[in-house]
Curated annotation (Swiss-Prot):
EC numbers for this chain: 2.7.1.6
Sites where the protein binds substrate: 34-37, 223
Broad class of where this protein is predominantly found: cytoplasm
Gene: galK
InterPro entries, alphabetized: Galactokinase, Galactokinase_bac, Galactokinase_CS, GalKase_N, GHMP_kinase_C_dom, GHMP_kinase_C_sf, GHMP_kinase_N_dom, GHMP_knse_ATP-bd_CS
UniProt site positions, description: Transition state stabilizer: 28
Residues binding ATP: 124-130
Alphabetic keyword roster: ATP-binding, Carbohydrate metabolism, Cytoplasm, Galactose metabolism, Kinase, Magnesium, Metal-binding, Nucleotide-binding, Transferase
Natural source organism: Salmonella schwarzengrund (strain CVM19633)
Protein name, UniProt field: Galactokinase
GO molecular function, one term: ATP binding
Lineage: Bacteria, Pseudomonadati, Pseudomonadota, Gammaproteobacteria, Enterobacterales
GO biological process, one term: galactose metabolic process
Amino acid sequence: MNLKEKTRALFAEIFGYPATHTIQAPGRVNLIGEHTDYNDGFVLPCAIDYQTVISCAPRDDRTVRVIAADYDNQVDEFSLEAPIVTHDSQQWSNYVRGVVKHLQQRNNAFGGVDMVISGNVPQGAGLSSSASLEVAVGTVFQQLYHLPLDGAQIALNGQEAENQFVGCNCGIMDQLISALGKKDHALLIDCRTLGAKAVSMPKGVAVVIINSNFKRTLVGSEYNTRREQCETGARFFQQPALRDVSLEAFNAVASELDPVVAKRVRHVLSENARTVEAASALEKGDLQRMGQLMAESHASMRDDFEITVPQIDTLVDIVKATIGDQGGVRMTGGGFGGCVVALIPEDLVPAVQQAVAQQYEAKTGIKETFYVCKPSQGAGQC
């Protein structure tokens, strides 16, 4: 049974009437452009065929009832008439409540909803299960009540909910690609203007995601440290963000910066340039150049931004040794564990899967999880 059938069946069973709509919003993988989003830079993600699905119906009162199918059918119920506050014990509820609370501040022309939520975006892998949930919930209200909100506004609403209500600092990329993703394309997103350009993916190329299953621990504290270091760098150049600093300007004065801050800045500036070039390489179908850019990106994350771990570096090395110059591989996501992403010809997928299965666990003591994904459509009815 797929997620649509599962949530519709559960909806009818629990609420006693049929859902009127089913909405999906995908997870994402970032092909290149890491830790550039909060520096007003560029990112190149694609939506993947793992998503959050919500079967839903409007109510004729001001109550929101939510069932989380993946959490033993836990229930959350709250009123649109009272101030929406955080839930004491159910963390998933706060993503839903936060989205609804922030929607009220944007456009209050909606009533209650019944919904059943289920998803298959792997959690804790850095594939944006939370952004997928936020965008799905926003799209539910937008579709059921015909709210005049576009994908970018639904994405911003989700980001606000996560930053201010859930209390987790995140850039805009994850929500934006979930809302705006395009089938068979990646999206070059300008995180300052929120402009997005669809970039066609070469035919016969697989998007492979391998979860290291190394448990991320440092991610929150280290993420905030990196943000502060980047802000320090921008202040040094008297610019609003590192987006506004050129590599030439940086190289001229790099020795005057704190050495650690200098490394962080160099990563962001070089990664921005790589990301813009990667979009044109992909569009031309130049997988070889894309592979070089992904390798440079990984080295920069490892050596300058210092966010990789030995397990991730091992995975990258195994994949690289198998594919040579036919495609690319790098860590993707915030760092300190999580996943690597590889762009490889479809006919090389079995060899890569076999090499990783034979070597990764033997070297690290951890078993990986292997996903082959398709660049998919952003949020909407399904």
